[in-house]
């Protein structure tokens, strides 16, 4: 599941990092990247390499959110479903990682409970963007539901998560979910804890949210 700068400026930034106290063993970090890198394009780690990293860290990529937190913290954002060598190396410098053991030691800190609301909002958006396929700007509904169940567990009330996933799964008119719908659901959960206060005429929520509220109202009447 899943401003411009010159090359000399990039080298300068890397050089300044290596001169900092507590600098990492850059050759060791590069060796980790090389082991995980794609065979056809050794400048990136793609899903197969990420799966290999999960094996080394004893993480289940299908259910353990910590792999997504790790990729977010490393700085994967250039393209979906991959991390470039520059992103990986910059992330290793920032997180002081130059061995698989250090990656393992970082795992306890990757719990989303350690993220404040703004950090989680950034991470939540990353989860959508990282799991896009190719040039698609939307995600398949089934993938979105699985992501919601993994990413929002323990972040929003269980009932809201369960009913929204149930609603989304049953709506035949929605086969794919947009980034706006994805991000709006999290905002909606924070801003409208009680559905009785929801006012469709005063809101600017996507239609998906309006229809969810109607769905819940009908459900409560039964």
Task: List PLM regions with ranges.
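Predominantly extracellular/lumenal beta-strand repeat domains
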Residues: 2, 10, 51, 99-100
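C-terminal helix/juxtamembrane-tail motif
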Residues: 205-222
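Acidic Ca2+-chelating loop motifs
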Residues: 39-50, 65, 76-93, 133-144, ...
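Amphipathic alpha-helical assembly/oligomerization segments
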Residues: 126-131
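EF-hand-based Ca2+ sensing modules
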Residues: 22-31, 53-83, 94-120, 124, ...
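Plant-biased recognition of short, low-complexity, intrinsically disordered N-terminal tails
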Residues: 1-34
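Compositionally biased, low-structure terminal segments
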Residues: 34, 89, 162-168, 183-186, ...
């Amino acid at each position: 599941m899943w401003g411009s700068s010159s090359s000399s400026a990039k080298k300068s930034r890397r050089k300044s990092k290596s001169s900092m106290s507590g600098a990492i063993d850059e050759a060791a970090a590069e060796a980790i990247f090389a082991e995980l890198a794609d065979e056809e394009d050794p400048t990136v780690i793609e899903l197969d390499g990420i799966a290999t990293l999960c094996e080394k860290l004893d993480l289940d990529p299908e259910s353990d959110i910590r792999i997504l937190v790790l990729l977010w913290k490393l700085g994967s954002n250039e393209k979906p479903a991959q991390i470039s060598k520059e992103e990986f190396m910059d992330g290793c410098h920032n997180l002081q990682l130059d061995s698989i053991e250090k990656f393992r030691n970082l795992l306890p800190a990757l719990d989303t409970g350690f993220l404040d609301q703004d950090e989680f909002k950034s991470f939540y958006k990353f989860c959508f963007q990282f799991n896009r396929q190719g040039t698609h700007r939307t995600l398949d509904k089934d993938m979105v539901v699985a992501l919601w169940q993994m990413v929002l567990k323990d972040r929003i009330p269980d009932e809201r998560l369960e009913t929204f996933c149930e609603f989304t799964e049953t709506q035949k008119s929605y086969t794919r979910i947009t980034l706006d719908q994805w991000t709006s659901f999290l905002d909606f959960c924070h801003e409208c804890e009680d559905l009785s206060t929801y006012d469709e005429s005063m809101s600017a929520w996507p239609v998906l949210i309006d229809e969810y509220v109607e769905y819940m109202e009908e459900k409560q009447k039964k």
